[in-house]
């Protein structure tokens, strides 16, 4: 097979986040984080539903996948972006979200991490919209 005919991966579409209570997670990601629900369908093979959401205008989605008790609450390594990390940090803190300190280190954009209701760790970095 030559390089010209070789198949390759050309993008990222969806990343999964394991959650114990899909209804609670759906409410958190929609109401607290402002994500849009794109799909919510039962999937017997997964033992729950396929719930797909995204930040407004994003081509990449998250799937809130039903998880066993011992699977949810992981460091997802997922990084979201915002135009204003300090404002979002304050807003999430005021909403009662478990948020760590806002990091303001020389040479890197402001960032912080937080946990969803299942304890999954997620990250936010300040990146102006025109750079995303």
Question: Where do the language-model regions lie?
Answer:
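Vicinal oxygen chelate
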Residues: 1-8, 14-17, 38-41, 49, ...
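Core segments of cupin and vicinal oxygen chelate
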Residues: 9-10, 16-59
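Eukaryotic phosphotyrosine signaling hubs
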Residues: 12-14, 73-78
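Short hydrophobic/aromatic beta-strand micro-patches
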Residues: 16-18, 54, 79-83, 125
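Short amphipathic alpha-helices within nucleic acid-binding modules
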Residues: 28, 86-91
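A short local loop/turn or secondary-structure capping micro-motif enriched for an aromatic residue
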Residues: 47, 69-73, 130-132
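Short, charged/polar surface micro-motifs in flexible loops or helix N-caps
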Residues: 56-60, 69-72, 85-87
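Short, charged/polar, Gly/Pro-enriched secondary-structure boundary elements
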Residues: 57-62, 118-122
